[in-house]
């Protein structure tokens, strides 16, 4: 895919950062020396980590050069690395591996999660938050539009770019044999959005990318118009005119054996 657009992503930064704050709040009281922020994006999550652990060796990792440039501008004193999480291997075991809204883009979690857990120091923590919204109207509509337009052939693979996350039971069984403790929970956020168009704009920065990028500009506009029509019906106005965007997310905080 093309590089990410940090400016578009930051349009809803407060809403995107809230789960990162919630994940950080569930990390047990500790003083980690080495922290990696996997899929750091424009640095909003890295900034939270830096504020809580100002003395730690903190590194943000992302495969988007544009996102890393934005993160470096935000946090000039932090270290950022352009790398693929699947090939990432830290020089030293990590005390905290933090991944906010990034691992859902990677496949084969059966291999990925044990691998990441193996990069922890004794008593280290793996903290993960992943959107779990592929069955929500917002994402069902993407697949529906893709299957019913002149772009059908072009977008045959778009819906499989991001796989459905595993169940809580599966993640528990992957981590528990190597963990002192595994904490898993699921939260649905209800974001009041000013309009159906705002919901589309939110998703243009993330979930819609695999559907839009293969299309020519004219087809892209037509796709977005068809998508907006479905979103407008799927998320009716509330009493104040806003639309409630339900956004389920899965959280995992696991501590390695001592």
Swiss-Prot record:
Domain of life: Bacteria
GO biological process entries: methylation
Stretches assigned to coiled coil: none
Protein location: Cytoplasm
MF terms (GO), sorted A to Z: trans-aconitate 2-methyltransferase activity
Keyword Methyltransferase on entry: yes
Catalytic activities: trans-aconitate + S-adenosyl-L-methionine = (E)-3-(methoxycarbonyl)pent-2-enedioate + S-adenosyl-L-homocysteine
A matching Pfam family: Methyltransf_25
EC top class, as a word: transferase
Main localisation: cytoplasm
E.C. number: 2.1.1.144
Keywords: Cytoplasm, Methyltransferase, S-adenosyl-L-methionine, Transferase
A single cellular component GO annotation: cytoplasm
InterPro entries in the cross-refs: Methyltransf_25, SAM-dependent_MTases_sf, Trans-aconitate_MeTrfase, Trans_acon_MeTrfase_C
NCBIfam families the UniProt entry points to: PRK01683.1 (NF002463)
Function: Catalyzes the S-adenosylmethionine monomethyl esterification of trans-aconitate.
Name of this protein: Trans-aconitate 2-methyltransferase
């Amino acid at each position: 895919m093309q590089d990410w657009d940090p400016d578009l992503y930051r349009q809803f930064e407060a809403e995107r950062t809230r789960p990162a704050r919630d994940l950080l709040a569930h990390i047990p009281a500790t003083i980690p020396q080495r922290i990696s922020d996997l899929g750091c994006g424009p640095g909003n999550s890295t900034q939270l980590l830096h504020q809580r652990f100002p003395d730690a060796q903190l590194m943000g990792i992302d495969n988007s050069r544009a996102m890393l440039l934005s993160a470096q501008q935000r946090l000039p004193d932090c270290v950022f690395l352009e790398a693929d999480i699947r090939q990432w291997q830290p020089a030293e075991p990590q005390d905290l591996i933090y991944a906010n809204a990034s691992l859902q883009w990677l496949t084969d979690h059966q291999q990925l999660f044990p691998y990441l857990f193996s990069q922890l120091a004794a008593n280290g923590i793996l903290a993960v938050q992943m959107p779990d919204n592929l069955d929500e109207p917002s994402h069902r509509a993407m697949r529906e539009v893709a299957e019913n337009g002149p772009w059908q052939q072009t977008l045959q693979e778009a819906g499989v770019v991001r796989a459905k996350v595993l169940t809580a039971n599966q993640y528990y069984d992957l981590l528990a044999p190597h963990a002192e403790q595994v904490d898993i929970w699921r939260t649905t956020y209800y974001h009041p959005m000013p309009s159906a168009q705002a919901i589309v704009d939110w998703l243009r920065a993330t979930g819609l990318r695999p559907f839009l990028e293969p299309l020519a500009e004219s087809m892209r506009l037509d796709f977005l118009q068809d998508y907006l029509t479905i979103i407008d019906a799927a998320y009716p106005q509330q009493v104040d005119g806003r639309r409630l965007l339900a956004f389920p997310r899965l959280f995992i905080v696991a501590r390695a054996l001592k």
